[in-house]
Amino acid sequence: MFRYLLCCFGLVLMYPTGIDMYLVGLPQIANQLGATEAQLHIAFSVYLAGMATTMLFAGSLADRIGRKPITLFSALLFALASYFAARSQSSDLFLVARFVQGVGAGCCYVVAFAILRDALDDKRRAKVLSMVNGVTCIIPVIAPVIGHLIMLRFPWPSLFYTMAVMGLLVFGLCLFVLRETYSKASFHSQTLPRVQTESFKQGFFISRVVITTLGVTTILSYVNVSPMLIMGQMGFDRGQYSNTMAMTALVSMLASFSTPFLLNQFKEKSLILFSQTLFAAAALVFILTQLGWLGQLFNLLGFGLVCSGFAIGFGVTMSQALSPFVARAGVASSLLGIAQVCTSALYIWVMGLLEVSAINILLAILAVGALISITLMLAVPKLSEMVANEQIPESA
């Protein structure tokens, strides 16, 4: 099992690394390419667009030709796109490279979840996805620090050369360590008849898509508005802001790595409901601070509750969402990724157009998301009869 965990960790980490590592070099990139920082901030959206437009394609292909070929192609594509981003001489070429980089990262992200679905049973998968989430949570803190250290001695292209090396390392892992978890023979003889029964229209899958999507939208909204809340509203300087984000990342990591142990004591449903209760509690804290009933420093408690809620609930809910699928696990993973990326981007964009304040952007998704998610968890039970029919490869 270790080989699958190692490869999937590498595949998943390319997605957040591609977002966070280059930000520290944005002023230098803008200066050299003759663009403004505001113009290059679109590189974030372009990267996500690359992910979203290819996720479904990657999942469908992974269900047809296998997981390993897609991981090799995607990791190599990420490495090549990173190299060409480093060599860009204009902002247009840079944005094209960022789009392709997003394509590679998105494919890797989708196939990693499909591999874990193939290789692990329901209980182990929930624990592993929580651990994957814990490692992912520290990337937004570690990646900019690594980027800063690199730029102390090297120019901004070195950031993308580093990402290219990372892509090549993951390519090597997948080539020499990863074993194919998807059997064509098994597919045609056993799982092909199940395609008709593995419907994406079933209420259980849709409910888990909604819950995970609301969770991702919540955490990305928090990351997006955190500078305005922490530095603008609370009056922290940049150093204090960095320390605050580092502490919340630590909270996320601790909560994520605690989840596997909690799963030994509590049911998955209980943990998901608890995570949504933490979101609701965070909304209450923010309301009380805005009314003046609590001091502004209590916002830090709210931030911790947001991060803990996401860390505890996301991996478990993702595992439940994938559990009904054997023959179509790749496409299921794709649909989850597309819903999460597109909904998050749309929510933040619409709230920006409506000029909603930073605190209200976060409050709205916390309150509404918790209410909807708790309702769905209570109304739509887990499809245990489908999970009981899973066939896990012996190699796991």
From Swiss-Prot:
For this protein, the record's NCBIfam families field holds: PRK10473.1
Q: Does the keyword Transport apply?
A: yes
Recall the taxonomic lineage recorded for the source organism: Bacteria, Pseudomonadati, Pseudomonadota, Gammaproteobacteria, Alteromonadales
- PANTHER family this protein is in? CHLORAMPHENICOL EFFLUX PUMP RV0191, PURINE EFFLUX PUMP PBUE
- GO molecular function annotations of the record: transmembrane transporter activity
Record key words, sorted: Cell inner membrane, Cell membrane, Membrane, Transmembrane, Transmembrane helix, Transport
Q: Name the encoding gene, please.
A: mdtL
Q: Which residues lie on this side of the membrane: Periplasmic?
A: 26-41, 86-92, 153-157, 231-242, 355-360
Main subcellular location of this protein, as a coarse class? membrane
Q: What is the official name of this protein in its record?
A: Multidrug resistance protein MdtL
